[in-house]
Amino acid sequence: MNRDNKQMLKTGKTGWLAAATGFVAMLVLAVVYLLSGGEAANPAEYVQGLPAAKEGAASSQNDDPILVFFTDPAYPDDPADHRDGLDEALAADIDRAQASVDVAAYDFDLESVADALVVAYRRGVRVRLVTDSDNAEELGARQLGSAGLPVVVDDRDAIMHDKFVVIDGRVVWTGSWNLTESGTYRNNNNVARIASDELAENYTAEFEEMFEEREFGPDSPADTPHRQVLVADGSEEIRIESYFAPEDRVADRLVELLAGAEDSIRFMAFSFTDDRLGDEMIRQHEAGLTVQGVFEGRNADPVYSEFGRMVEAQPRMDVRLDGNTYMMHHKVIIVDDKAVALGSFNFSEAADTVNDENLLIIYDRGIASLFRAEFRRIYREALEGRE
Protein backbone atom coordinates (compact mmCIF):
# COMPACT_ATOMS: atom_id res chain seq x y z
CA MET A 1 0.00 0.00 0.00
CA ASN A 2 1.60 3.25 -1.18
CA ARG A 3 0.73 5.18 1.94
CA ASP A 4 2.12 2.57 4.34
CA ASN A 5 -1.27 1.82 5.89
CA LYS A 6 -1.23 5.27 7.45
CA GLN A 7 -4.62 4.77 9.04
CA MET A 8 -3.08 2.11 11.27
CA LEU A 9 -0.66 4.62 12.74
CA LYS A 10 -3.44 5.96 14.91
CA THR A 11 -3.96 2.89 17.08
CA GLY A 12 -1.42 2.17 19.85
CA LYS A 13 0.81 2.19 24.92
CA THR A 14 3.81 3.34 27.03
CA GLY A 15 5.43 3.30 30.36
CA TRP A 16 6.12 5.29 33.45
CA LEU A 17 7.75 8.62 34.18
CA ALA A 18 10.27 9.77 36.74
CA ALA A 19 11.37 13.33 37.45
CA ALA A 20 14.62 14.32 39.14
CA THR A 21 17.14 17.14 39.21
CA GLY A 22 15.19 19.31 36.81
CA PHE A 23 15.07 16.74 34.01
CA VAL A 24 12.41 14.18 33.22
CA ALA A 25 13.37 10.71 32.05
CA MET A 26 11.06 8.02 30.80
CA LEU A 27 11.53 4.63 32.42
CA VAL A 28 9.85 2.12 30.17
CA LEU A 29 10.41 -1.51 31.09
CA ALA A 30 13.34 -0.17 33.09
CA VAL A 31 15.08 0.19 29.74
CA VAL A 32 16.58 3.63 29.74
CA TYR A 33 20.13 3.95 28.60
CA LEU A 34 22.52 6.46 30.12
CA LEU A 35 25.63 6.60 28.03
CA SER A 36 27.92 6.83 31.00
CA GLY A 37 29.74 3.58 31.26
CA GLY A 38 27.72 1.85 28.57
CA GLU A 39 25.29 -0.11 30.76
CA ALA A 40 21.55 -0.01 31.07
CA ALA A 41 20.51 1.75 34.25
CA ASN A 42 18.56 0.28 37.11
CA PRO A 43 15.37 2.39 37.45
CA ALA A 44 15.95 3.49 41.04
CA GLU A 45 19.61 4.22 40.44
CA TYR A 46 18.73 6.08 37.28
CA VAL A 47 16.28 8.40 39.00
CA GLN A 48 18.69 9.11 41.83
CA GLY A 49 21.64 9.58 39.53
CA LEU A 50 20.28 11.94 36.91
CA PRO A 51 22.78 14.65 36.03
CA ALA A 52 22.11 18.18 37.21
CA ALA A 53 20.67 20.24 34.37
CA LYS A 54 21.18 23.95 33.82
CA GLU A 55 18.10 25.81 34.99
CA GLY A 56 15.59 26.10 32.16
CA ALA A 57 17.86 24.77 29.44
CA ALA A 58 16.92 21.76 27.34
CA SER A 59 20.32 21.93 25.67
CA SER A 60 22.51 21.80 28.76
CA GLN A 61 26.01 20.49 28.18
CA ASN A 62 25.29 18.21 31.16
CA ASP A 63 22.69 16.27 29.18
CA ASP A 64 23.38 12.61 28.67
CA PRO A 65 24.24 12.41 24.98
CA ILE A 66 21.81 9.61 24.08
CA LEU A 67 18.70 8.33 25.84
CA VAL A 68 16.61 5.52 24.35
CA PHE A 69 12.96 4.92 25.29
CA PHE A 70 10.48 2.14 24.49
CA THR A 71 6.74 2.13 25.01
CA ASP A 72 5.11 -0.55 27.16
CA PRO A 73 1.56 -1.32 25.97
CA ALA A 74 -0.83 -2.89 28.47
CA TYR A 75 -3.80 -5.05 27.53
CA PRO A 76 -6.61 -4.34 27.75
CA ASP A 77 -6.06 -0.63 27.28
CA ASP A 78 -7.63 1.72 29.83
CA PRO A 79 -7.58 5.43 28.90
CA ALA A 80 -7.67 6.24 32.62
CA ASP A 81 -4.09 4.91 32.77
CA HIS A 82 -2.84 7.24 30.03
CA ARG A 83 -0.38 9.19 32.16
CA ASP A 84 3.34 9.32 32.94
CA GLY A 85 4.21 8.49 29.35
CA LEU A 86 6.59 9.63 26.66
CA ASP A 87 4.40 12.66 26.05
CA GLU A 88 5.17 13.98 29.52
CA ALA A 89 8.89 13.37 29.06
CA LEU A 90 8.89 15.34 25.80
CA ALA A 91 6.70 18.08 27.29
CA ALA A 92 9.18 18.48 30.14
CA ASP A 93 12.01 18.91 27.63
CA ILE A 94 9.95 21.51 25.76
CA ASP A 95 9.35 23.32 29.05
CA ARG A 96 13.11 23.77 29.34
CA ALA A 97 13.56 25.17 25.81
CA GLN A 98 15.05 28.66 25.65
CA ALA A 99 15.12 29.57 21.96
CA SER A 100 13.33 27.23 19.56
CA VAL A 101 11.30 24.07 19.10
CA ASP A 102 10.70 22.62 15.62
CA VAL A 103 8.24 19.74 15.28
CA ALA A 104 7.77 17.53 12.22
CA ALA A 105 4.86 15.24 13.09
CA TYR A 106 2.90 13.03 10.73
CA ASP A 107 0.19 12.66 13.37
CA PHE A 108 -0.22 14.77 16.51
CA ASP A 109 -3.06 14.61 19.03
CA LEU A 110 -1.22 14.71 22.38
CA GLU A 111 -2.73 17.51 24.43
CA SER A 112 0.18 17.54 26.90
CA VAL A 113 2.70 18.21 24.14
CA ALA A 114 0.47 20.76 22.41
CA ASP A 115 0.00 22.60 25.72
CA ALA A 116 3.76 22.66 26.33
CA LEU A 117 4.39 24.06 22.86
CA VAL A 118 1.81 26.83 23.30
CA VAL A 119 3.25 27.76 26.70
CA ALA A 120 6.75 27.85 25.22
CA TYR A 121 5.54 30.07 22.38
CA ARG A 122 3.90 32.49 24.82
CA ARG A 123 7.13 32.89 26.77
CA GLY A 124 9.05 33.82 23.63
CA VAL A 125 10.33 30.52 22.27
CA ARG A 126 10.05 30.16 18.47
CA VAL A 127 7.76 27.17 17.86
CA ARG A 128 7.01 25.76 14.39
CA LEU A 129 5.09 22.72 13.17
CA VAL A 130 5.10 20.74 9.92
CA THR A 131 2.42 18.07 9.58
CA ASP A 132 0.61 16.06 6.93
CA SER A 133 -2.76 16.88 5.39
CA ASP A 134 -4.10 13.50 6.52
CA ASN A 135 -3.92 14.70 10.10
CA ALA A 136 -4.09 18.49 9.81
CA GLU A 137 -7.38 18.53 11.71
CA GLU A 138 -6.07 16.53 14.66
CA LEU A 139 -5.79 18.21 18.05
CA GLY A 140 -2.11 19.15 17.79
CA ALA A 141 -2.24 21.19 14.59
CA ARG A 142 -5.59 22.73 15.51
CA GLN A 143 -4.48 23.81 18.97
CA LEU A 144 -1.21 25.30 17.74
CA GLY A 145 -2.91 27.06 14.85
CA SER A 146 -5.58 28.51 17.13
CA ALA A 147 -2.86 29.90 19.40
CA GLY A 148 -1.25 31.69 16.46
CA LEU A 149 1.70 29.35 15.96
CA PRO A 150 2.87 28.79 12.37
CA VAL A 151 1.80 25.45 10.91
CA VAL A 152 2.80 24.13 7.48
CA VAL A 153 0.82 21.25 5.96
CA ASP A 154 2.06 18.83 3.30
CA ASP A 155 -0.98 18.33 1.08
CA ARG A 156 0.55 15.96 -1.47
CA ASP A 157 -0.85 12.49 -2.13
CA ALA A 158 2.34 11.09 -0.61
CA ILE A 159 2.90 11.78 3.07
CA MET A 160 5.16 13.77 5.36
CA HIS A 161 5.82 10.79 7.62
CA ASP A 162 8.56 12.23 9.87
CA LYS A 163 8.30 12.12 13.67
CA PHE A 164 11.03 14.36 15.02
CA VAL A 165 11.49 17.33 17.34
CA VAL A 166 14.50 19.67 17.50
CA ILE A 167 14.95 21.74 20.67
CA ASP A 168 17.27 24.76 20.88
CA GLY A 169 19.30 23.56 17.89
CA ARG A 170 20.88 21.03 20.19
CA VAL A 171 18.54 18.16 21.12
CA VAL A 172 16.83 15.79 18.66
CA TRP A 173 13.97 13.42 19.46
CA THR A 174 13.35 10.87 16.69
CA GLY A 175 12.12 7.32 16.18
CA SER A 176 8.94 5.47 15.29
CA TRP A 177 6.84 7.35 17.86
CA ASN A 178 3.89 9.36 16.53
CA LEU A 179 2.81 12.16 18.87
CA THR A 180 -0.54 10.50 19.56
CA GLU A 181 -2.39 8.82 22.42
CA SER A 182 -2.27 5.54 20.53
CA GLY A 183 1.39 5.91 19.66
CA THR A 184 2.19 6.60 23.30
CA TYR A 185 -0.08 4.20 25.18
CA ARG A 186 -1.09 1.36 22.85
CA ASN A 187 1.51 0.81 20.14
CA ASN A 188 5.03 -0.58 20.44
CA ASN A 189 7.34 2.33 19.63
CA ASN A 190 10.84 3.62 20.18
CA VAL A 191 12.36 7.07 20.36
CA ALA A 192 15.91 8.31 20.87
CA ARG A 193 16.78 11.63 22.49
CA ILE A 194 20.19 12.73 21.22
CA ALA A 195 22.09 15.84 22.29
CA SER A 196 24.29 16.80 19.34
CA ASP A 197 24.75 20.15 17.63
CA GLU A 198 25.64 18.52 14.31
CA LEU A 199 22.73 16.08 14.31
CA ALA A 200 20.38 18.91 15.25
CA GLU A 201 21.80 20.89 12.33
CA ASN A 202 20.86 18.01 10.00
CA TYR A 203 17.30 17.85 11.28
CA THR A 204 16.92 21.62 11.29
CA ALA A 205 18.06 21.75 7.65
CA GLU A 206 15.46 19.13 6.73
CA PHE A 207 12.80 21.00 8.68
CA GLU A 208 13.66 24.28 6.96
CA GLU A 209 13.27 22.64 3.54
CA MET A 210 9.72 21.68 4.42
CA PHE A 211 8.72 24.70 6.49
CA GLU A 212 10.37 27.55 4.58
CA GLU A 213 10.84 26.18 1.05
CA ARG A 214 7.83 23.82 0.92
CA GLU A 215 10.15 21.16 -0.49
CA PHE A 216 8.65 17.76 0.20
CA GLY A 217 9.37 14.27 -1.06
CA PRO A 218 11.34 14.09 -4.33
CA ASP A 219 11.62 17.90 -4.39
CA SER A 220 13.78 17.86 -1.27
CA PRO A 221 17.48 18.43 -2.07
CA ALA A 222 20.19 16.00 -0.96
CA ASP A 223 22.12 18.48 1.16
CA THR A 224 22.33 16.99 4.66
CA PRO A 225 25.17 18.94 6.35
CA HIS A 226 26.69 16.01 8.25
CA ARG A 227 26.20 12.52 6.86
CA GLN A 228 28.09 11.15 9.84
CA VAL A 229 28.24 12.64 13.33
CA LEU A 230 30.23 11.66 16.39
CA VAL A 231 28.51 11.99 19.75
CA ALA A 232 30.86 12.30 22.71
CA ASP A 233 30.38 9.77 25.48
CA GLY A 234 33.01 10.49 28.08
CA SER A 235 36.35 9.60 26.56
CA GLU A 236 34.72 7.74 23.66
CA GLU A 237 32.63 8.74 20.66
CA ILE A 238 29.55 7.10 19.20
CA ARG A 239 29.20 7.17 15.42
CA ILE A 240 25.79 7.96 13.95
CA GLU A 241 24.83 8.07 10.27
CA SER A 242 21.96 10.43 9.40
CA TYR A 243 19.67 10.01 6.37
CA PHE A 244 16.50 11.55 4.96
CA ALA A 245 14.23 10.06 2.33
CA PRO A 246 13.75 10.11 -0.51
CA GLU A 247 16.79 12.25 -1.33
CA ASP A 248 19.41 10.11 0.43
CA ARG A 249 18.59 6.72 -1.15
CA VAL A 250 17.94 5.22 2.25
CA ALA A 251 16.98 1.72 1.07
CA ASP A 252 20.27 1.43 -0.83
CA ARG A 253 22.15 2.25 2.37
CA LEU A 254 20.15 -0.33 4.30
CA VAL A 255 20.93 -2.98 1.69
CA GLU A 256 24.63 -2.15 2.16
CA LEU A 257 24.24 -2.43 5.92
CA LEU A 258 22.58 -5.83 5.59
CA ALA A 259 25.17 -7.04 3.08
CA GLY A 260 27.92 -6.21 5.55
CA ALA A 261 26.41 -8.29 8.33
CA GLU A 262 28.73 -11.02 9.59
CA ASP A 263 26.72 -12.82 12.25
CA SER A 264 23.11 -11.73 12.72
CA ILE A 265 20.24 -9.58 11.49
CA ARG A 266 17.14 -8.93 13.58
CA PHE A 267 14.29 -6.62 12.64
CA MET A 268 10.92 -5.31 13.80
CA ALA A 269 8.78 -4.01 10.95
CA PHE A 270 5.45 -2.22 10.90
CA SER A 271 5.48 -2.32 7.10
CA PHE A 272 7.95 -4.39 5.06
CA THR A 273 7.28 -4.57 1.32
CA ASP A 274 10.66 -3.63 -0.21
CA ASP A 275 11.97 -6.59 -2.25
CA ARG A 276 15.56 -5.35 -2.19
CA LEU A 277 15.72 -5.47 1.58
CA GLY A 278 13.87 -8.78 1.61
CA ASP A 279 16.24 -10.25 -0.99
CA GLU A 280 19.32 -9.31 1.03
CA MET A 281 17.90 -10.74 4.25
CA ILE A 282 17.00 -13.99 2.49
CA ARG A 283 20.47 -14.14 0.93
CA GLN A 284 22.14 -13.69 4.30
CA HIS A 285 19.83 -16.32 5.82
CA GLU A 286 20.82 -18.78 3.10
CA ALA A 287 24.47 -17.93 3.75
CA GLY A 288 24.08 -19.14 7.32
CA LEU A 289 23.59 -15.93 9.29
CA THR A 290 20.99 -15.72 12.03
CA VAL A 291 18.06 -13.73 10.61
CA GLN A 292 15.00 -13.15 12.79
CA GLY A 293 12.11 -10.75 12.45
CA VAL A 294 8.72 -9.69 13.75
CA PHE A 295 6.13 -8.20 11.38
CA GLU A 296 3.07 -6.16 12.31
CA GLY A 297 0.42 -8.78 11.63
CA ARG A 298 -2.14 -6.48 10.03
CA ASN A 299 0.39 -5.47 7.38
CA ALA A 300 1.65 -8.98 6.53
CA ASP A 301 -0.29 -9.02 3.26
CA PRO A 302 0.36 -12.32 1.43
CA VAL A 303 0.86 -10.50 -1.88
CA TYR A 304 2.90 -7.43 -0.96
CA SER A 305 4.59 -8.15 2.37
CA GLU A 306 8.01 -9.80 2.58
CA PHE A 307 6.61 -12.06 5.30
CA GLY A 308 5.30 -14.64 2.82
CA ARG A 309 8.61 -14.86 0.95
CA MET A 310 10.54 -15.34 4.17
CA VAL A 311 8.21 -18.03 5.46
CA GLU A 312 8.67 -19.89 2.18
CA ALA A 313 12.47 -19.61 2.22
CA GLN A 314 14.40 -22.87 2.57
CA PRO A 315 15.11 -23.47 5.33
CA ARG A 316 12.20 -21.46 6.74
CA MET A 317 13.26 -18.11 8.17
CA ASP A 318 12.51 -17.33 11.81
CA VAL A 319 9.93 -14.61 11.24
CA ARG A 320 6.76 -14.03 13.27
CA LEU A 321 3.60 -11.94 13.36
CA ASP A 322 3.46 -9.58 16.33
CA GLY A 323 1.36 -10.19 19.44
CA ASN A 324 0.26 -6.62 20.18
CA THR A 325 -3.53 -6.32 20.27
CA TYR A 326 -3.06 -2.83 18.83
CA MET A 327 0.04 -2.09 16.69
CA MET A 328 3.69 -3.11 16.65
CA HIS A 329 4.96 0.11 15.09
CA HIS A 330 8.77 -0.28 15.21
CA LYS A 331 10.92 0.22 12.11
CA VAL A 332 14.18 -1.24 13.42
CA ILE A 333 17.07 -3.34 12.10
CA ILE A 334 19.80 -4.64 14.42
CA VAL A 335 22.99 -5.87 12.73
CA ASP A 336 25.59 -8.03 14.50
CA ASP A 337 24.36 -6.68 17.85
CA LYS A 338 26.44 -3.55 17.29
CA ALA A 339 24.53 -1.36 14.81
CA VAL A 340 20.90 -0.21 14.93
CA ALA A 341 18.85 1.43 12.17
CA LEU A 342 15.83 3.35 13.48
CA GLY A 343 13.52 6.21 12.58
CA SER A 344 10.28 6.85 10.73
CA PHE A 345 11.39 4.86 7.66
CA ASN A 346 9.13 1.90 6.90
CA PHE A 347 10.73 -0.76 4.72
CA SER A 348 8.68 0.12 1.65
CA GLU A 349 8.99 1.68 -1.78
CA ALA A 350 6.78 4.59 -0.73
CA ALA A 351 9.09 5.41 2.17
CA ASP A 352 12.11 5.30 -0.11
CA THR A 353 10.75 7.23 -3.09
CA VAL A 354 7.91 9.63 -2.24
CA ASN A 355 7.35 10.10 1.50
CA ASP A 356 9.36 12.38 3.77
CA GLU A 357 11.23 10.14 6.20
CA ASN A 358 14.30 10.05 8.40
CA LEU A 359 16.62 7.27 9.55
CA LEU A 360 19.61 6.95 11.86
CA ILE A 361 22.18 4.17 12.02
CA ILE A 362 23.79 4.13 15.46
CA TYR A 363 26.98 2.15 15.97
CA ASP A 364 27.17 1.21 19.64
CA ARG A 365 26.93 -2.17 21.36
CA GLY A 366 25.24 -0.72 24.43
CA ILE A 367 22.42 0.82 22.44
CA ALA A 368 22.19 -2.29 20.27
CA SER A 369 21.76 -4.36 23.45
CA LEU A 370 18.72 -2.28 24.39
CA PHE A 371 17.10 -2.82 21.02
CA ARG A 372 18.00 -6.51 21.23
CA ALA A 373 16.19 -6.66 24.58
CA GLU A 374 13.17 -4.95 23.02
CA PHE A 375 13.33 -7.43 20.14
CA ARG A 376 13.30 -10.34 22.60
CA ARG A 377 10.22 -8.90 24.28
CA ILE A 378 8.39 -8.33 20.98
CA TYR A 379 9.44 -11.78 19.73
CA ARG A 380 8.17 -13.42 22.94
CA GLU A 381 4.83 -11.64 22.56
CA ALA A 382 4.70 -12.82 18.95
CA LEU A 383 5.11 -16.42 20.11
CA GLU A 384 2.28 -15.94 22.61
CA GLY A 385 0.00 -14.44 19.94
CA ARG A 386 -2.58 -11.67 19.94
CA GLU A 387 -5.16 -11.61 22.70
What is each model feature region?
Residues 2-152, 158-159, 166-387:
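Charged, low-complexity intrinsically disordered terminal segments
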